[in-house]
Amino acid sequence: MQQKISVTGYNHYQERLRSLLTEENFYYTLSKAELFSIDYAGDVDPDEKIYRYEIAECSLRIQHDPVNAYDPAALKVFADGVHIGYVPRAEFYTLKRIAAQPDLRMRVDVYGGPYKVLEEKEPGADWMCEFDPKDYVLRKDEDPVRAIMIFEW
């Protein structure tokens, strides 16, 4: 079984989270024409974000933070030893239930940051028509880097 819990407070830890993203995504290095040519193989879908970095699978550690000014019951989340945020208060009970599972495996996945996406110049064109690179633009943007805790048993 698997349970996922998003890390909260990630906006305050963007620099730390970015430092965990180290593996470049091959598809991010490709040009519009190259992305378009591999789309036919089903590797890349138009309108799907192609992040610069692969998802980083990190070790997870959770630690009580009794001196937290906002919540003395706060639980810090660490990815590969780096403090990246907190367990949402609403998930404390879920986390307690998960912690009781035998053979519990846990990790934290870090994702997001710079991306590019192939977008139609005129959205809503007939999808049955042939794909044509000139009908698309390659737009770059950036999402906040986020983290999600993954528990499996």
Where on the chain are the PLM-derived regions?
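Conserved active-site motif detector
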Residues: 1-153
